[in-house]
Amino acid sequence: IVKTKKHFSYGKLLEILEPSPHRVTPACPVAAKCGGCQLQHLSYEGQLSFKTKKVKDHLERIGGFSGISVGYAKGMEEPWRYRNKAQFPVGGKTGEPEIGFYAKRSHRIIDTPVCMLQNKINDQIVKIIRAFLTEYEIPLYDETTHRGLVRHILTRIGRRTGEIMVCLVVNGRKLPHCDVLVERLREIEGMTSIVLNVNTAQTNVILGTEVHVLWGKETIRDYIGDVQFEISPLSFYQVNPLQTQVLYQTALDFAELEGNETVLDLYCGIGTISLFFAQKAKHVFGVEIVPEIGRAHV
């Protein structure tokens, strides 16, 4: 036991005396080091059970409700390689890039050549960029000194359209030899957008507000149900499009709209919920604090 609260305690696992029937060997070789996944030691069925119980516990313990009926978590047919967005921090010494994800509760980069949650095309994209950074000895960003150029790699992939976006986040206004990198990335089937995002702020915020197109378009397209969306590097868009459609359809079914209602969608982003509900409601109003994102479908 490492910490005790009034009604619960925190503990640290020291030894497994008898494994749960749901305990499995993580599919990812760096699962024990990377902070991206916390439940890979559980079977997928075990994860769904854990999440269902967690919702029920929170409603009862934090919300103070009792006798609440909580439906079982709806799972995916294939719970791997589902993410349509990846954000890879870049660091290490110049010529020896580390690209991957942060270790748990830290900003120490765990070099990750392969991620089991990301689209497979990301493995190829990272491999190309890693070779480029090494070959041209591009300065890599150091979060402690705020020196170096390349901070992050952001990718977005349209699940339905197959369109791909690659965004390099840089601590400056230019990327040396970017024409070489563009030519190499363009060889990937589906490549639609290659952009540079300028972030010179001395913060942990990943993206800046300034975007320059190096090749192709500034946006890619994807669908949720029958609704098409244009997605920029700055857009908020659900990272699991298959389950997003399940989630939105479930909410729409629960709403039992008859076609005369007005729906208000707060913090609407690019309007994924707004436009999905517009199929049934009379009026839908989306409210967004970021003007550029809010105007994406105007």
Task: Describe the residue ranges of each PLM region.
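SAM-dependent transferase fold signal centered on methyltransferase-like domains
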Residues: 1-212, 224, 253-260, 297-298
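Rossmann-like S-adenosyl-L-methionine
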Residues: 177-188, 192-297
